Amino acid sequence: MVRAPEPELIEKMRTTPLAGLASSLGIDIDAWLPIASSPLPVTMRLTPRRHDIDWTREQLIAMGGKRIEWLSTIEAWQMPFPKGDIPDDAKAMLMILHETGRITRQEAVSMLPPVVLEPAKDSLVMDTCAAPGSKATQLAEAIPDGLVLANEPSSGRLNMLATNRGRLGLANMLIMQHDGRHIGRMPEPGIEGIVVDAPCTGTATTRKNRDLWWGWSPKDGRSMFQLQTDIAYRAAQLLVPGGLMVYSTCSIDPTENEAAVCEILRRCPWLELVNIDANRLFPGLVVHHGIDNWEILDEEANPIEWTGEIPRLPGLKEEMLNPLIRGEEAPPLSYTIRVHPHDNNTGGFYVALFRHIPEATPEGIAKSMILKRKLMREPVELPRQNPNRHTINPADSELVKTICDKWGIDASAFSWWHRGKRTNIASPMTLSRLYHPTVQNNKGDFWPGDAFHPLRIVHVGQPSFTDNKGFWRPRGEAMELLRPHITKNLVDVDETTLIDMLKGNVPLVEDFPVEIETGSSILRCGEHLAPVWVAARVSFMVSEKERDVLRLKLGVEVGGEEE
């Protein structure tokens, strides 16, 4: 059910420049306004391949959740309540499911770009503007045998990205920190798939940001144009021939959408637009094709008649005008898609799909890796970078052996990384595609292999083990990732023992019903696994929210009493 604002407020919104922008696009304002000004429904992505995914589905159904049918290639759900009006019991349950990595709260339209990209399951892909991480983690879930480079320039937002990676236990994600316009050089041949979810004015996000109604004017979209196209240009330089790149925004402004696409094609003649098959990818979703005849708007969003001269408006440049005005043949902008809130009870979104034309680059590598001038001498090995606090190194073989012997893990299933008291596990592709190869600079010299430089990699894979007084214990958030691989130090207990501990009892070792070694172990009760630390007592080493999941599954009230 959609709860629209009072009629008086809607009438005020009708007079805003934002409504003028929508009207200039041919949007039915009477149908659009009540939805575009109402709260969004709560939506989420269900984490695939978890052992208890059926249990999670049961919780969503019990709250009145329903599958989003038009997202047919992933499992997404919509709740029967809006974001600002979640019942208390549902709010508590959603928090438990989200924080333990069973769901990811995410707008439905935000899930479009990774689906449009359709990455191969063993490919190397990149998200250029990844925080807070909903699309990057969706990509990682889509390519379990591949690798995601998640880039974020802001340190604060990068921490959110790392939190979401850790919450979901993803070993196939690397987090790096670059200005998206200047992402570092990397090994040949480049990247197979890229998502550029560009920074934008968010004019399609009015359902969660009401300030836009009163704060937006056309100059805001123009102010984003250069940044958006610069980020996309750098991404296109890193794309392998035949590779795909998605450009997307949560804006309805053609300056940030179709005009940006035209500029990307002008600057990147090796790219072509690909027709997005929305009927196949999103069956039942109402979409609109991209346009090629957008109008010039003044600061009140009133259309300005073209007189042959560019109007003197804040930030307006020739490349922001539609191709018909510029006297140019328009690219097939109808290949791109727009989603409007009132058609599907969603937010709004714009998506374009590009392909690196293989014939445009017979060298078979990304454009940034082709020397502008042939090197007339032997290439020189460049000096290694000095290590710093962010430097991540492969774990020592003895350390890996210690962990794998303790827990019965096949070391070859992962690449192993060490920093401080943590050991991370990552996709083996991390070594073969990014760490071992040499990297050429723009002069033809090269940095030696066995380093990530010049990429500024901040986090590799999933933190999975912590050194605790000489014992390498598994981290609670990594348990789902480790579950299929751990074969030793699993201590079987009955439900009574587990329930007793979930009620708050921390038993002495001598009172524990089964023999258990000092240090780190994992309690197993049927399908339930719980890491513990054993000293004088046996103590849980999992988060309180994960304990709440165990309580719910075993019939123990989250408050501590048995149901």
Specify the residue positions occupied by each region the protein language model found.
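Conserved Class I S-adenosyl-L-methionine
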Residues: K219-S223, E258-F282, I291, E295-E300
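Conserved class I S-adenosyl-L-methionine
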Residues: D122-A131
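S-adenosyl-L-methionine
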Residues: N151-P189, V196
